[in-house]
Each structure stands twice: as C-alpha cells, then as structure tokens.
C-alpha cells in the first residue's frame, strides 16, 4: 500500500549520542543498539475514523525515534500496518450506510494527509491487513502444526485460537498479573467467554467466516485474520525476529503487543520478539479521557481545516514527555502557537548566538528517552537570547532552523 510523501530532512554535522528508550518489558530506560539498519515496527490505525490527537501523539513520537536514529547515521527500516479488516470498521460502515472498503480507503487517505501535514516520515513498508492475509494463513498453519494453536469445537464457527501457554515467557512484555490481563482482555477486543476455548485469555488467530463479513479461503477453513497475528506476520516477514523497536500507544501493551510478541516467538522458537517495547501515553481533553464513547475526540484534520498550523500541533504534542498521559486544552495549543511564532521570528533574525551548543543540547535531550520538553526548552533559550540581542553569528539562525527541522520535524525558516 502507498504511504505518503517523504519530506526532505536536512543533514546535520557533528555526532549524536546513543539513543536510550524506556522498555516496557524491562521496566527501565536502556540503550537502543541497532546495527547499521535500525528496525522499527509501529502499529497503525484501524481506518474507520479520522486521525485524532491520540493517534497523532503516537506517530509523532515514533517519528522522533526515526529522526534520532537517522541523525545517528542509521538507515531505518520502518514498518507500519493498517488494520483494514476489523469489527470497528464494519460497524462504522454499517452505521453510516457505506461500503466498509470505501470507508477504509477514505480514512486511510485522510491519515496520509494528516501525517504529511505533521511532517511524519513515512514507513518504508506500509502494509494493510488484506495485503498480508497469505502471510497470516502461513503463520497460522505453522502454529497449528506445532500445537501452539487449536481449532475450537464449534461446527458452525471453527475459529482458530492461540494457546496462552504456548510460550514459557508469556506475560513478560506487559508484566501484568492474571487479573489485570483478564480485565484488559475483556475491555480491548478479547472474547474471554467464547465457548470451547481452553483458556479465557487465548486469543483468536483466525475468525471463521460469518455472514456479512469478508473472508478468505484457508486450509483450516474460510475466515479472516485475528488482530494480533497480523502484526506478527507483517513484522517477521519484513524485519525478522528480535527487531529493534515495537511501538504503539500504552493501550496496546496488553493484549495486542503481548500476543503479537507471543505469536512471533512461538513461530520462531525465540525468547523475544523485539528488543525494545516502547509505548506512548494517552491524550485527554480538558481533564477527561479522550474517547469515541465520550464524543470528545479532537481530530488533526479538523484543526487543520480551522486554520491551525500543523507545526503548532506537532509542537503542542512534543511539549509533554511521550510516556506521560497529557491533556489537550485551548491553552496548550495557544502556547504552541506562540512558541512557533517566537521560533520563526528568531530564525529570521540576521544573527544569533553560536548554534553548536544548542544543537548539542537538542541531541542530548532527544537521545535521553526522547526528552522533548527539555529539547524545546533548549530552543526557547536560544530564541530568548536572540530577542535580547545576544550573539553575532550570522550563520546561527539558519543552523538552528536546520536542526529544528531535522530533529523535531518543525519548519521555522
């Protein structure tokens, strides 16, 4: 599937410190130590609605990871999926009286437009679930053959399930106890009460064909892929086992990332699917959790339509640490708009303080678990010096503008 245009990223001189990120599985900030090619997998959208700020915060975060790794000299093999076959898409299409394929296509294009506006670097591989069905079928066949999966005893709907006990290490990624797993499994798309399952937490690999749902032929019966195995197959077939970073929002820690890891590990007889599991916090609105049920989602496309500069949206999302849950308010956006104006005014100045120390601080803060608040503060400090007339280097404003573009994805000149 086509992604979106790749913005030009300025090349900076000098060296960048090694990137360190918090790993959910190890509960610690650890160095990311890729080879010449860094490998990154980020779970994509289910295209039944427009890109809201929670989505945007996640993709901007991993764009920061991408930019830091590139600045360190790595080639980055970035893979992102699209869950273009799933219940929420069917339900929204039925509600709106449209074909689910048309709805998915429209929302994917809107997502592309939003990512382009936010200057998010596109993935090298942008893969839809429908594109990967053959890969999923092959993976499910292997899991059935190894005993890691089973078919429920249901002549009408012989779904295929993954055994939670198929890997000894199941649960290491989230670190959750059984009760927490059970709660999140029920809340986040699981089916603990499905008759015929050997364990309430066993996750569906292949949903047998139902009336009114798309299906594909498979040796174990017609149906469609489960959510978790899609990501396992897509990642393994493009990045291999133990790729560098698996990323997404913290609502994906369990069950999605736990099971996609377990599927991949069972398929390859490996202990670890990814070297780092990295998760972003949630975005709320005016003191409340942002959710579809509350009807308080803030959409990037609506902000853009209302004339908000996408660079200001990006700066607003970078103002808090990526792992923190944060609130979106009018004041947050106003602060970002003001900051963007101050940065652009300073970048247009005829001269300013030497850029090298500020660029070094930018790199240092971003390498330290993406400390974007401190990175923004470093640019703020340079701009404040320009306003007070400190510094006489005529090359500095352009150098700062290049660094802000390359490292933060924000154009100020």
UniProtKB/Swiss-Prot annotation:
Cofactor: Zn(2+)
Stated family: Belongs to the class-I aminoacyl-tRNA synthetase family. MshC subfamily.
GO biological process per UniProt: cysteinyl-tRNA aminoacylation; mycothiol biosynthetic process
Disulfide bonds: none
Keywords assigned: ATP-binding, Ligase, Metal-binding, Nucleotide-binding, Zinc
Protein role: Catalyzes the ATP-dependent condensation of GlcN-Ins and L-cysteine to form L-Cys-GlcN-Ins.
Ligand binding (Zn(2+)): 43, 231, 256
Catalytic activity: 1D-myo-inositol 2-amino-2-deoxy-alpha-D-glucopyranoside + L-cysteine + ATP = 1D-myo-inositol 2-(L-cysteinylamino)-2-deoxy-alpha-D-glucopyranoside + AMP + diphosphate + H(+)
One Pfam family from the record: tRNA-synt_1e
GO MF annotation list: ATP binding; cysteine-glucosaminylinositol ligase activity; cysteine-tRNA ligase activity; zinc ion binding
Protein name: L-cysteine:1D-myo-inositol 2-amino-2-deoxy-alpha-D-glucopyranoside ligase
Residue window of motif 'HIGH' region: 45-55
Subunit comment: Monomer.
The record's free-text note on cofactor binding: Binds 1 zinc ion per subunit.
A cellular component annotation (GO) from this entry: cytosol
EC id: 6.3.1.13
SUPFAM superfamilies reported in the protein's UniProt record: Nucleotidylyl transferase (SSF52374)
Residue ranges annotated as motif 'ERGGDP' region: 187-192
Residues binding L-cysteinyl-5'-AMP: 43-46, 58, 81-83, 227, 249-251, 283
Positions of short motif 'KMSKS' region: 289-293
Enzyme class: ligase
Source lineage: Bacteria, Bacillati, Actinomycetota, Actinomycetes, Mycobacteriales
């Amino acid at each position: 599937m086509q992604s979106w245009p790749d913005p030009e990223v300025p090349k900076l001189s000098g060296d960048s410190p090694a990137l360190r990120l918090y790993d959910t599985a190890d509960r610690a900030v650890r160095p990311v130590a890729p080879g010449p090619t860094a490998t990154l997998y980020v779970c994509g959208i289910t295209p039944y609605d427009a890109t809201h700020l929670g989505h945007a915060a996640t993709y901007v975060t991993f764009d920061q990871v991408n930019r830091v790794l590139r600045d360190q000299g790595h080639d980055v093999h970035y893979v992102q999926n699209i869950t273009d076959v799933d219940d929420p898409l069917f339900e929204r299409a039925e509600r709106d009286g449209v074909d689910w394929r048309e709805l998915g296509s429209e929302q994917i294009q809107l997502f592309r437009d939003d990512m382009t506006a936010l200057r998010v670097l596109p993935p090298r591989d942008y893969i839809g679930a429908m594109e990967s069905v053959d890969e999923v079928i092959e993976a499910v066949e292997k899991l059935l053959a190894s005993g890691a999966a089973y078919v429920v005893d249901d002549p009408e709907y012989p779904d295929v399930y993954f055994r939670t006990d198929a890997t000894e290490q199941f649960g290491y990624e989230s670190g959750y106890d059984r009760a927490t797993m059970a709660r999140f499994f029920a809340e986040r798309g699981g089916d603990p009460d499905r008759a015929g399952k050997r364990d309430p937490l066993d996750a569906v690999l292949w949903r047998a064909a139902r009336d009114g749902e798309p299906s594909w032929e498979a040796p174990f019966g017609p149906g469609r892929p489960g959510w978790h195995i899609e990501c396992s197959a897509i990642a393994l077939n493009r990045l291999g086992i133990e790729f560098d970073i698996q990323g997404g929002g913290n609502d994906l820690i369990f069950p999605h990332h736990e099971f996609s890891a377990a599927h991949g590990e069972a398929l390859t007889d490996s202990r670890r699917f990814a070297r780092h599991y990295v998760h972003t916090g949630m975005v709320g609105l005016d003191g409340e959790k942002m959710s579809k049920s509350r009807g308080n989602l803030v959409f990037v496309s609506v902000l853009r339509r209302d004339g908000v500069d996408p660079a200001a949206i990006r700066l607003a999302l970078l103002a808090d640490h990526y792992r923190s849950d944060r609130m979106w308010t009018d004041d947050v956006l106003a602060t970002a708009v003001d900051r963007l104006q101050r940065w652009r005014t300073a970048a247009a100045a005829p001269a300013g303080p030497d850029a090298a120390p500020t660029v070094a601080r930018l790199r240092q803060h971003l390498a330290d678990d993406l400390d974007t608040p401190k990175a923004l503060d470093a640019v703020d400090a340079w701009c404040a010096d320009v306003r007070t007339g400190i510094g006489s280097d005529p090359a500095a404003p352009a150098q700062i503008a290049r660094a802000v573009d390359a490292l933060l994805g924000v154009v100020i000149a």
